[in-house]
Amino acid sequence: MRIHYLLFALLFLFLVPVPGHGGIINTLQKYYCRVRGGRCAVLTCLPKEEQIGKCSTRGRKCCRRKK
């Protein structure tokens, strides 16, 4: 019977997300960027664009054309 508790604990440890890896947060930020009419840039925005937010926790920027 105690083996079930051990197996449950190991399964739980493997399913817990790693700290600093915000998969759900990054997905929501990308979606919010696209809803606002932007795109996700890896390094910097193009000269005719402005930064309107972030696309991920790792520093990708959400850029949109200047109005």
UniProtKB/Swiss-Prot annotation:
Record SUPFAM superfamilies: Defensin-like
InterPro entries: Defensin_beta-like (IPR001855)
Superkingdom per UniProt: Eukaryota
GO cellular component, one term: extracellular space
Protein family (similarity comment): Belongs to the beta-defensin family.
Stated role: Exhibits antimicrobial activity against Gram-positive and Gram-negative bacteria.
Protein name per UniProt: Beta-defensin 103A
Encoding gene, per UniProt annotation: DEFB103A
